């Protein structure tokens, strides 16, 4: 087995500088009101790296680099949330999601209705198995950042679904038209809990 020698120019293509990143735009799904998107997502999400995929997804489209393909594919991003904020409960069915707390404190909630939780402090890490309904929420008193790592087969990165009651929450808070726009835009509701 031999080593690989790469020069500084090639190594620079493998560096992502935070100061050069812009947050990934909030998903725009057929004129879904921005407050619905805010309910479903972190305040800001910075995509550092995503796998090269045949079907371009929002993960790859806005990533600073494509890579991490040493076997299973990997996506690396940072979710930034103000106190009390985080995405809606959801499940990844074919990919594994891991969280590393960078700043503030984050509750990792899981279970069919998010009935279980634990708190990550800075430098704490958790790995959530596929199929588990989960979310994260900043429970600190200041804006926080969470490193989010998703790993799986490159064509399985659009595997997110939301429990049916999240659809009910959207309908109650934002109306049936908002939910219709979410589902027609590709969001899946009605996860099966076994």
Task: Tell me the role of every PLM-derived stretch.
Residues 2-12, 135-194:
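Double-stranded beta-helix
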Residues 55-64, 77-92:
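Conserved short histidine dyad/triad with adjacent acidic residue
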Residues 69-73, 93, 141:
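A generic fold-level signal
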Residues 79, 99, 126:
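Conserved GNAT-family N-acetyltransferase fold
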Residues 82-84, 120-141, 149-151:
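Conserved metal-binding segment of the jelly-roll/cupin
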Residues 86-89, 93-122, 132:
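A short beta-strand-loop-beta hairpin characteristic of the jelly-roll/cupin
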